[in-house]
């Protein structure tokens, strides 16, 4: 049987499209294990959408957690040198409480992180990648940019392929 992207499920096609987009932009894939030391999440509770985290004691006695977030792990392990900008993308499962069912849910999440020397050019790249990501998914979309400085710099980068409205 010959491989064809057309035979993939929509989620798989989306993942391939976004991976190609991010790698073409120079981002590297970040992969982490399922578990992270609970202390990382305890120290950064205000960053998380919920303080509820699935924890367990590992065989060596460390308190571990099923990851509720990927950004914190990337920030902890990716250490850019002064002046360096690192760009990572990820496709990971995270574990978060569901308000509707009052249980934990496993959520497939794909995202992009820029760390280090992040200036105007990197912000422009990230926002453009966000728009291109939404476009690659094929549905109608609206990208809201809430910082006027970012918005003005985006207007100056190139001719938009979509109309830009400022309200």
Please provide the spans of the model-predicted regions.
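Extended, charged alpha-beta segments that form solvent-exposed binding/catalytic grooves
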Residues: 2-7, 13-14, 20-72, 76-158, ...
